[in-house]
């Protein structure tokens, strides 16, 4: 092979590893973000170590590992895969990292609105710059919403680990890329029952995965659709009620004005923030969240944070 052909061959090869930097805003709350990403110390998809974290992702069809060092004003990222990465791997990794770190929206308008109200300003005290942290992709957000229905966070973590172990894909570094719709669609309800899934939860999760595989629920299209259309599409899916729909809209699609009414963390956060003698019912939750519009997703994330590790 002559030198020109060798040069062309090398240029045509797709890398298995690449690095890039992502600019972070001033006073980015890195420690708080790392705390959120590391809530499950036994996670099979993410690991936090000091000021760094690693997470299993899908880049194209390739299970990959993204290692990220959070430094002042920058996130240094290294993407690694067991096979060759697609040509747009860096763009995909940047997009997913931006979602994970909450960089797709600016907190300033929400914070200005809070600071203008003496009653609401305490919500952001000590948490200026806090973000809406999204899931790496929309299906992961859907999975979290279904797993988290009517159970506490610790058990939701347990169910997700079992699901990842069964339907996720090994990535470098000993972590897994999360389950994709096709893998979940191949599961049977009876199998998930052995993992302590309720029958309904198993049916809902497998059912939504099969709808996605069949093209009946297009998550890519919903990513650019208006909020009303997204909510209607989600509510049409068996197993997704108003709480699940708003959770998915917030964490999977990044909508800024969602209220996951009935969420246990939201209920406890509202009771704590407003010093209520009793936990608010659904109507009271909507009324209490009204002053935070049109930034109720932001308020929800802050209310969760008031609970510390409980949320």
Language model segments and positions:
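HhH-family (HhH-GPD) DNA N-glycosylase catalytic core used in base-excision repair
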Residues: 4-311
């Amino acid at each position: 092979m002559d030198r020109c052909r060798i040069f062309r061959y090398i240029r045509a090869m797709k890398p298995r590893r690449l690095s890039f930097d992502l600019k972070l805003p001033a006073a980015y709350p890195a420690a708080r973000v790392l705390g959120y990403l590391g809530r499950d110390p036994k996670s099979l998809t993410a690991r936090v170590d000091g000021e760094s974290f690693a997470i299993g992702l899908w880049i194209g069809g390739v299970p990959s590992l993204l290692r990220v060092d959070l430094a002042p004003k920058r996130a240094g990222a290294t993407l690694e895969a067991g096979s060759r990465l697609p040509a747009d791997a860096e763009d995909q990794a940047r997009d997913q990292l931006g979602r994970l770190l909450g960089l797709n929206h600016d907190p300033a308008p929400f914070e200005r609105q809070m600071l203008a109200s003496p009653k609401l300003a305490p919500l952001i005290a000590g948490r200026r710059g806090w973000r809406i942290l999204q899931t790496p992709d929309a299906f992961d957000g859907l999975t979290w919403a279904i797993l988290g229905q009517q159970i506490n966070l610790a058990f939701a973590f347990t169910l997700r680990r079992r699901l990842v172990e069964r339907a996720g894909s090994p990535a470098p570094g000993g972590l897994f890329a999360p389950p994709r719709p096709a893998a979940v669609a191949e599961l049977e309800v009876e199998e998930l029952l052995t993992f302590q899934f309720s029958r309904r939860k198993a049916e809902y999760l497998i059912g939504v995965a099969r709808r996605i595989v069949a093209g009946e629920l297009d998550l890519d299209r919903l990513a650019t659709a208006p909020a009303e259309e997204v909510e209607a599409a989600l509510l049409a899916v068996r197993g997704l009620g108003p709480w699940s729909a708003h959770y998915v809209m917030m964490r999977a699609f990044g909508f800024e004005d969602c209220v996951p009414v009935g969420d246990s963390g939201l209920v406890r956060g509202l009771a704590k923030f407003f010093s209520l003698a009793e936990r608010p019912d659904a109507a009271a939750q909507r009324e209490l969240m009204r002053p935070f519009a049109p930034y109720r997703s932001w308020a929800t994330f802050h209310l969760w944070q008031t609970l510390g590790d409980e949320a």
